[in-house]
Amino acid sequence: MAKYLFVYHGGSRPPTKEAQEKAMAAWGAWFGSMGKAVVNGGNPVGKSWTVKSDGSVVMDGGSNPASGFSLIEAPDYNGAAALAKGCPLLASGGSVELAQVIDM
């Protein structure tokens, strides 16, 4: 099975403690539904910076900054996309970027 990096973008932060607990339960249920396909559940990420080839540093996160990541196993891109479609972030307008990890 191939490994896929899921990079989460966007979405909204739950405004209340109750909403945060509901969101965490949804993430837990989603990870649970994927079972052993979850290699590394990952984490949310903070503010991002970009170092450019000219040495300049952009500190605004860019147009679509990452909000988190996970490492998932799937047979192919279609299988990975099918798993990503269950991501709770999608319900709040976010997206999941998929990239196959190349073993070296």
How does the language model describe each region?
Residues 1-104:
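Conserved, structured core segments of small domains
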